[in-house]
């Protein structure tokens, strides 16, 4: 018997057997052990979830703003009370160190839910005077039933990023977590019900993206899809959504983000920022600053500081509190990252440190890849052009500000960017020219609930978090009122 046993779908406020009874395994990437069996949804299950959501959504939307706010706040309290329990599940499912999941994953997800719970009473329309006898007023009404499709790197946080604004606006959601990391989304569903969310308002369907995800994007009963994943999958989502019922779509599709270090930067601080921008969560963060641009004159000194810091990384069992670098999320993903590393070697980049999978001792049965740093990289190399989503840093040298801005923007992605400098005039001047939706100056990675998150170019459509996201889960109804007589031309 696996640690977490058989995991059912969550439909209409209860854990429910799938129609087919088919299952797939959840695997701990730290040791290869099966930790749960998850039921796989099919078309009938999708229809059941949509029907339940359509029944529950009007009940939820009819509640007062304060009633809905109190229910979501209760869910926040439960999440925080169970932080350690949920963190342990997340660590077993993703391989992320417990030191991360305890302090970041559940905490930041709960923060987003609390933020939107507080905004519910502020969701209001407008009154627009036309003339003495007439005016217009607007109402922000829910879209109805919406779908969220999550990625595998921040399972619970992403489930909350998608469900919090959707529920706050009065919608019902059907959420499909990544088939690689599904466990905490199922836990979240139970927490919402325990907090008082009406049956059918939050449903979880586990299974593959090619099947369940596609069914959700094509389903005529769904009004909006919020998707996090890769570009190729995102294009399919958009095509399916447009080809079915012209659904609204929000997508976050990853990046190949530049981190620019200027000559006046504190080099120790710059090295610390580069480490966090590349090796946090074993490099499995969509906003990672994997293209690190350094002035040619400082390149050798910067490389030395990076190598010193990489050697201090504590790689090990993610359940060990001392570990700050765990395995990749799956063995399949480990192999993908290793192919990129091999590509970097073949194309002539200089390997400073790492560049291999860890296969000895206690790490032998896990999906571990050593933190890897390449230097003397060229802009046309595969490791510089493509998103690796692993612990691989590419160091590139440059000569001038104009040159580095041009090269930083020379990518199909546009999710994030950052600069490290003591010259604030330069910082703002450069940031204003970088083609990225999320930018940091002298820091990296923090994303508060108030901060809109999303990309330029192929990195996405729309935004998550912030006030505007709540508005995008509503539709505006305009009503004109005439207080005097009506004159007809007939």
From Swiss-Prot:
Name assigned to this protein? Betaine aldehyde dehydrogenase
- Quote the record's cofactor note: Binds 2 potassium ions per subunit.
Q: In which pathway does it act?
A: Amine and polyamine biosynthesis; betaine biosynthesis via choline pathway; betaine from betaine aldehyde: step 1/1
> Is NADP included in the keywords of this UniProt record?
yes
Q: Which PROSITE patterns match?
A: ALDEHYDE_DEHYDR_CYS, ALDEHYDE_DEHYDR_GLU
Q: Which organism is it from?
A: Yersinia pseudotuberculosis serotype IB (strain PB1/+)
Which NCBIfam families does the protein's record reference? BADH, PRK13252.1
UniProt record, GO biological process: glycine betaine biosynthetic process from choline
UniProt function note: Involved in the biosynthesis of the osmoprotectant glycine betaine. Catalyzes the irreversible oxidation of betaine aldehyde to the corresponding acid.
Positions annotated as active site in the UniProt record:
162, 252, 286, 464
What are the Cysteine sulfenic acid (-SOH) sites (modified residues) in this protein?
286
Look up the record and name the cofactor or cofactors this protein needs.
K(+)
Q: Where is this site: Seems to be a necessary countercharge to the potassium cations?
A: 248
Gene3D superfamilies in UniProt: Aldehyde Dehydrogenase, Chain A, domain 1 (3.40.605.10), Aldehyde Dehydrogenase, Chain A, domain 2 (3.40.309.10)
Binding of NAD(+), residues? 150-152, 176-179, 230-233, 254, 286, 387
Q: Which reaction does it catalyse?
A: betaine aldehyde + NAD(+) + H2O = glycine betaine + NADH + 2 H(+)
Q: Where does K(+) 2 bind?
A: 246, 457, 460
Recorded hits in SUPFAM superfamilies, A to Z, give: ALDH-like
Keyword Manganese on this protein?
no
Q: Which domain of life is it from?
A: Bacteria
Q: Which GO terms describe its molecular function?
A: betaine-aldehyde dehydrogenase (NAD+) activity; metal ion binding
Q: Which residues bind K(+) 1?
A: 93, 180
């Amino acid at each position: 018997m696996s640690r977490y046993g058989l995991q059912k779908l969550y439909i209409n406020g209860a854990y429910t057997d799938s129609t087919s009874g088919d299952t797939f395994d959840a695997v701990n990437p730290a040791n290869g052990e099966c930790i749960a069996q998850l039921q796989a949804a099919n078309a009938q299950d999708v229809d059941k979830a949509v029907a339940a959501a359509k029944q529950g959504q009007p009940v939820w939307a009819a509640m007062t703003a304060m009633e809905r706010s109190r229910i979501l706040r209760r869910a926040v309290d439960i999440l925080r009370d169970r932080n350690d329990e949920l963190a342990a599940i997340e660590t077993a499912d993703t391989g992320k160190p417990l030191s991360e999941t305890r302090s970041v994953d559940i905490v930041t997800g709960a923060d987003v839910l609390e933020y939107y719970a507080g905004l519910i009473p502020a969701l209001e329309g407008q009154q627009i005077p036309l003339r003495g006898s007439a005016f217009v007023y607007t109402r922000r009404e829910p879209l109805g039933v919406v779908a969220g499709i999550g990625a595998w790197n921040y399972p619970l946080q992403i489930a909350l990023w998608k469900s919090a604004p959707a529920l706050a606006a009065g919608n019902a959601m059907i959420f499909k977590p990544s088939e690689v990391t599904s466990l905490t989304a199922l836990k979240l569903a139970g927490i919402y019900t325990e907090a008082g969310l009406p049956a059918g308002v939050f449903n979880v369907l586990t299974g593959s993206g090619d099947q369940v995800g596609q069914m959700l994007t094509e389903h005529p009963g769904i009004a909006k899809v919020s998707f996090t994943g890769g570009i190729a999958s995102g294009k399919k989502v958009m095509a399916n959504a447009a080809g079915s019922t012209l659904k609204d779509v929000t997508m976050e599709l990853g990046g190949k983000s530049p981190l620019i270090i200027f000559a006046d930067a504190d080099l120790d601080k710059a090295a610390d920022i580069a480490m966090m921008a590349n090796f946090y969560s074993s490099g499995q963060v969509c906003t990672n600053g994997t293209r690190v641009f350094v002035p040619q004159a400082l390149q050798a000194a910067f490389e030395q500081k990076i190598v010193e810091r990489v050697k201090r990384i504590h790689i090990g069992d993610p359940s060990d509190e001392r570990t700050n670098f765990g395995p990749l999320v799956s063995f399949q993903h480990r192999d993908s990252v290793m192919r990129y590393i091999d590509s970097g070697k073949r194309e002539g980049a200089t390997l400073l440190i790492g560049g291999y999978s860890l296969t000895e001792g206690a790490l032998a049965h896990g999906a571990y890849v050593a933190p890897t740093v390449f230097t003397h990289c060229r802009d046309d190399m595969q490791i510089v052009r493509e998103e690796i989503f692993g612990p691989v840093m590419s160091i590139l040298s440059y000569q001038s500000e104009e040159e580095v801005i041009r090269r930083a923007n020379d990518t199909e992605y546009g999710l994030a960017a950052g600069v490290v400098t003591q010259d604030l005039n330069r910082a703002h001047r450069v940031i204003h020219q970088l083609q990225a939706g999320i930018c940091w100056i002298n820091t990296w990675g923090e994303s508060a609930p108030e901060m809109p998150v999303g990309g330029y170019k192929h990195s996405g459509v729309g935004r998550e978090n912030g006030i505007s996201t709540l508005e995008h889960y509503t539709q505006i109804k305009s009503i004109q009122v005439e207080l005097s007589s009506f004159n007809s031309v007939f």
